[in-house]
Regions:
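Conserved GNAT acetyl-CoA-binding A-motif
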Residues: 101-115
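Conserved acetyl-CoA pyrophosphate-binding loop and the N-cap/start of the following alpha-helix
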Residues: 84-97
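A conserved beta-turn-beta hairpin within the catalytic core of GNAT-like acetyltransferases
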Residues: 67-77, 85, 104-108
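Conserved active-site alpha-helix within GNAT-family acetyltransferase domains
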Residues: 109, 116-131
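Conserved beta-strand in the GNAT
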Residues: 52, 58-67, 74-81
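Short amphipathic alpha-helix that is part of the acyltransferase structural core
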Residues: 1-47, 55-58
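Residue-level recognition of the GNAT/N-acetyltransferase active site
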Residues: 81-85, 113-115
């Protein structure tokens, strides 16, 4: 099986097509699949670093990393999505997101925004990543 390709860009570096595809996937998963009705376009994307994994032309996971004081008090990771489950892409995107939070924003503490049902996923993964 092919290994997914990591993409990492600031909002300003995103092409129009990339931005559209990221927002389309977020809407498809959060609004349509999970029935989470909230304002996805919250004004924080412009200051964030966007990460996504692709296999071919398909996004299999994505996340955004927000600097201190943008979305939460601390550096934060949110809008985490996997479109293909059971392949470890969620863990991969979280590892890359944590590395990005530390490298680009100097994070020593990271807030993770998650829906209630997903908190166990993050708690289990974070302990294996951050020691």
């Amino acid at each position: 099986m092919n290994k997914p390709i990591l993409h990492k860009k600031t909002f300003q570096e995103l092409t129009t097509d990339e931005l559209y595809e990221l927002l389309r996937v977020r809407s498809e998963v959060f609004v349509v699949e999970q029935n989470c009705v909230y304002q996805d376009l919250d004004g924080d994307d412009q200051n964030s670093i966007h990460l996504w994994l692709t296999l071919g032309n398909r996004i299999v996971a994505l996340a955004r990393v927000c600097p201190v004081g943008t979305h939460m008090k601390e550096v934060s990771i949110g809008r985490v999505i996997t479109t293909v489950r059971g392949k470890g892409y969620g863990k991969q995107i979280m590892i890359h997101s944590i590395e990005t939070a530390i490298k680009h924003f100097g994070a020593t503490h990271i807030d993770i925004e998650a829906q209630e049902y997903a908190k166990g996923f993050y708690e289990n993964r974070i302990q294996t990543v951050v020691r």
